[in-house]
Every structure is written in C-alpha cells, then in structure tokens.
C-alpha cells in the first residue's frame, strides 16, 4: 500500500519558486528591513539546548498526529501501524514545509486513503479527516477560552468552534444508526464508528490532545530560550494564534505569517517587539527544520518498506539519520561547552 504520487509541473515550479524566494530572504534579511535583520541576529544568540527541546516537542506532535489518524482509520478498516501512520503524516508535513497552499495535506490524504480497500475509500478518508479536525477543535476551544480571557484574541473564533463542535455531535448522532448505501455515505464511516465506540473516540481525542500539548511545549521552550516571563502562559497564547494563522497557508511552512502571529501573541503577553519577532522566527525555523528532517526520514521509511526496495535500505537510512542527528547535536550543544 505504497502509492505512486505524481506532481504537475505547475506544482513543482510553484514550490521551487517559493523555496527560492525564502532562500533569498534568509540570505539577505536586510531586504525586509533593519528590524527583521536584528531579529534574526537575536535568534543566533539563544541557547541551542532550548531549540533542540522545541524540535523534540515538534517530533512528538507530528508522531501523535499520525497516530490520531491511525486511531480513526483503524475503526474504518484501515490496515496500518502507528509507525506507518506517523510516516505517512510526516511525508505530508515535509511537502507542506517546502510547498505553499497545503499541498502536503493533499498528499497526506492520498497516502492515508491507500490503507483502505473498501469502496468509497476517499469518502471514508474525508470523514476521518473531519473527525480528526473535530477532535482538534475541542483542544483549540480550550486554548481560545484562555486567549480570549487574556484579551489577546476576540470571542468570535470561539463561537465558530462551538458551532463546529455542535455540528459534529449532531453528525455523530445521525450516523450511529445509519448504514452506507452510496459512496458519499462513507463520509460518515468514521463518525459512525466513533459514536459506537466511546473508547475509540477517547483515544482519538487523546492523541490529538498529545499533539496539541507537544506544540505548546515547543512554544514554551522557544519562549524560555528568549527569557520570556512565564513561558508556559505565553505558549498557551501562541497556540490559538498559530491555528488561526494556519487557516490560509500562502508560503511554504506558513513562514512569515506564523512568525507574525507568534510575535503578536507574545507582544500581547508583554514581550518587547524585537524579542517577540525573534521568537516567532525561531519557532518557524525550528518547526520547518523538524518537518524537513522528520518528513525525509518518513519518506525513506515508506520507501524501505516497499516491496521493490532492498532490505538494507531501512537500516542504512536509520544509521544515516542517527549519525546526522548526533553530528548536529554535537556541533550545536556539546562543542560550545568544551
């Protein structure tokens, strides 16, 4: 069940152009003004230990998100392990890091759909995506309550989420006692399965909650790296700001938009504009680097698991990844201490 995915020339050119523009900006930050250049300088001055802690939290979030998909897919007849699910999710994150317009999300959808053999698998996968989104809305609503109470965000996103959750509950109640008579009806497969098994629903919500908590942990580490007071409280404000900024991804990895959202949330927490901007840039940089590394490893894992791949390829890929991580950690953390 390892799909062959094809990309049009337009998609490839769009991705290469976006990445090229980001490289130009990264190599010449003065193009964006003195404030951005100073913010990039602030990123280079922080302790790499906190950045590695944030990277580990991002990896946890990616893996947990893949497991959330697997928990819903398994109830719909999907045949995949948690490791396989995390790898498929990671490939989508890899593409999202280098391509705009959430191209990676479409690829992720295709990869997960290949784990189903029944008719209407695309509809079923769509329902799984909707169920994962509904579970994510629960945790996002909790963060939005905190952000709204702090005066960082308005109340209308919370009202929208309440409507989404109410609609989800209604769909689950309707889907419980219905059976699919057409392909489109398979969109309710996930809701039907989760409604009949509260344990499965709790497992899905738990995995999504772990992913959300890991992202909050990453934001906490970044805030601590820049000396932000009460970094956990600051991170709780960053979470909903990032989710709202991610609704429309115009750049690879949502770089720029995400950094601005983080800077806005931290500034509302009382952080100076320069430090807030540096923290936003650091968050986006670490998240993008983690997505690239985790996604590349995921792609190698899926390739090594294919029937046509040589048996030694998985071991070679794992060994190369371990050596690369050890070298990077030694160069950024251990060597400066010597």
Model-derived features with residue positions:
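Extended non-transmembrane interhelical loops and adjacent amphipathic helices
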Residues: 71, 86-119
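Hydrophobic alpha-helical transmembrane segments of ABC transporter permease domains
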Residues: 128-150
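Transmembrane helix boundary and interhelical junction motifs in multipass membrane proteins
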Residues: 63-67, 99-109, 136, 245-263, ...
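Membrane-interface alpha-helices at helix entry/exit sites of multi-pass transporters
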Residues: 82-87, 104-106, 116-133, 270-283
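Transmembrane helix-loop junction
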Residues: 74-75, 97, 114, 224-225, ...
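Predominantly cytoplasmic-facing regulatory/coupling regions of multi-pass membrane proteins
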Residues: 1-90, 146-247, 278-279, 286-338
């Amino acid at each position: 069940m390892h799909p062959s995915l094809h990309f049009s020339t337009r998609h490839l050119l769009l991705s290469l152009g976006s990445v090229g523009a980001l490289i130009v900006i990264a190599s010449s930050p003065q193009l964006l003004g003195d404030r951005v250049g100073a913010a990039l300088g602030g990123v280079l001055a922080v302790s790499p230990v906190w950045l590695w802690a944030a990277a580990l939290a991002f990896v946890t979030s990616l893996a947990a998100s893949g497991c959330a998909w697997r928990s819903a897919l398994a109830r719909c007849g999907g045949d995949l392990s948690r490791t396989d699910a995390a790898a498929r999710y990671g490939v989508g994150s890899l593409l999202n890091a280098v391509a705009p317009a959430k191209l990676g999300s479409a690829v992720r959808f295709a990869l997960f759909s290949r784990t189903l053999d029944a008719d209407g698998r695309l509809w079923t996968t769509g329902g799984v995506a909707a169920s994962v989104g509904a579970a994510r809305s629960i945790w996002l609503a909790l963060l939005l309550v905190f952000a709204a109470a702090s005066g960082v965000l308005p109340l209308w996103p919370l009202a929208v989420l309440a409507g989404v959750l109410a609609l989800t509950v209604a769909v689950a109640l309707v889907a419980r006692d219905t059976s699919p008579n057409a392909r489109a009806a398979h969109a309710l497969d996930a809701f039907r399965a989760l409604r009949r098994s509260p344990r499965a629903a709790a497992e899905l919500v738990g995995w999504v909650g772990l992913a959300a908590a890991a992202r909050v942990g990453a934001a906490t580490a970044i805030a601590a790296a820049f000396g932000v007071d009460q970094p956990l409280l600051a991170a709780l404000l960053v979470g909903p700001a990032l989710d709202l900024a991610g609704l429309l991804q115009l750049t690879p990895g949502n770089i720029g938009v995400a950094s601005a959202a983080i800077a806005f949330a931290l500034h509302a927490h009382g952080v100076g504009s320069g430090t807030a901007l540096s923290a936003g840039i650091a968050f986006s940089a670490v998240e993008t680097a983690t997505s690239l590394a985790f996604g590349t490893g995921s792609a190698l894992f899926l390739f090594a698991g294919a029937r046509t791949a040589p048996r030694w390829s998985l071991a070679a890929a794992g060994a190369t990844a371990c050596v690369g991580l050890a070298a990077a950690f030694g160069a950024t953390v251990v060597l400066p201490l010597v």
